[in-house]
């Protein structure tokens, strides 16, 4: 148990220490989407803060799309610059993508936008300042509660992965049984067909007085 607590504490420290992403997206007249993928569990709050340099009308149109792997779209914003915040609650455990598309309005110009992306989910996405004010919590109480919620989320994630592994193993075993049963059925059918062909040829030769 102490080992698990130490592991969780270390993982929490790594999660908290993660900073936002910084990258550039070159403008193109035929742009391809650049996507950042993350995973979220059912019921988790997700908050994505996006900042782009430049300005609208600077010769490039930066488009934003936020959607998950099951087809839900949470935000679509075209030709934006500056700050955008996207918040949603995941309806199911799935991966989601934050995608950017930078379209150049003119050919022959080398343009790009610098993007800053910060994605937080679960306990990290909650407004702890507001919670502290509403519930009149001390700073240490807020921090302990935040760490507790992060720990619960990690335990839930580990439980989900364990259950998923069990489902995949059951599916694999079921598939193996079906393949084995199908192979046995094929052998029986082929053997029966062989016996029938032998009897048919034997009767045919007898009627022709060949044997």
Curated annotation (Swiss-Prot):
Keywords per UniProt: Endoplasmic reticulum, ER-Golgi transport, Golgi apparatus, Membrane, Protein transport, Signal, Transmembrane, Transmembrane helix, Transport
Subcellular localization, as worded in the UniProt entry: Endoplasmic reticulum membrane; Golgi apparatus membrane
Organism whose genome encodes this protein: Saccharomyces cerevisiae (strain ATCC 204508 / S288c)
Ranges of the Lumenal topological domain: 21-180
Coiled coil: none
Pfam families: EMP24_GP25L
Family as reported in the entry's similarity comment: Belongs to the EMP24/GP25L family.
Database matches in PROSITE patterns: GOLD
Keyword Lipid metabolism: no
Cited function: Constituent of COPII-coated endoplasmic reticulum-derived transport vesicles. Required for efficient transport of a subset of secretory proteins to the Golgi. Possesses a C-terminal dilysine motif that interacts with COPI coat subunits. Facilitates retrograde transport from the Golgi to the endoplasmic reticulum.
Intervals, Cytoplasmic compartment: 202-211
Recorded GO CC terms: COPII-coated ER to Golgi transport vesicle; endoplasmic reticulum; endoplasmic reticulum membrane; endoplasmic reticulum-Golgi intermediate compartment; fungal-type vacuole; Golgi apparatus; Golgi membrane; Golgi-associated vesicle
Membrane topology, from the record: Single-pass type I membrane protein
Lineage: Eukaryota, Fungi, Dikarya, Ascomycota, Saccharomycotina
GO biological process: endoplasmic reticulum to Golgi vesicle-mediated transport; Golgi organization; intracellular protein transport; vesicle budding from membrane
Record's protein name: Endoplasmic reticulum vesicle protein 25
Subunit composition and interactions: Associates with EMP24, ERP1 and ERP2.
Further information: Present with 51700 molecules/cell in log phase SD medium.
């Amino acid at each position: 148990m102490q080992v698990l607590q130490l592991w969780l504490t270390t993982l929490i420290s790594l999660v908290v220490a993660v900073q936002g992403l910084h990258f550039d997206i070159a403008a193109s007249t035929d742009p391809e989407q650049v996507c950042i993928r993350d995973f979220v569990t059912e019921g988790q709050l997700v908050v994505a803060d996006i900042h782009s340099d430049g300005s609208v009308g600077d010769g490039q149109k930066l488009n934003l799309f936020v959607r998950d792997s099951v087809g839900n779209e949470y935000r679509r914003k075209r030709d934006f610059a500056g700050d955008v915040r996207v918040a949603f609650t995941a309806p199911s455990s799935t991966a989601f993508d934050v995608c950017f598309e930078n379209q150049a309005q003119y050919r022959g110009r080398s343009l790009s936008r610098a993007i800053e992306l910060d994605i937080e989910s679960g306990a990290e996405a909650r407004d702890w300042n507001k919670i502290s004010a509403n519930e009149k919590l001390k700073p240490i109480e807020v921090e302990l509660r935040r760490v507790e919620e992060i720990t619960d989320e990690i335990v839930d994630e580990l439980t989900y992965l364990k259950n998923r592994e069990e489902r995949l193993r059951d599916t694999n075993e079921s598939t193996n049984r079906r393949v084995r049963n199908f192979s046995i059925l094929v052998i029986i059918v082929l053997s029966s067909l062989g016996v029938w062909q032998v009897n048919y040829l034997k009767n045919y030769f007898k009627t022709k007085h060949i044997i």
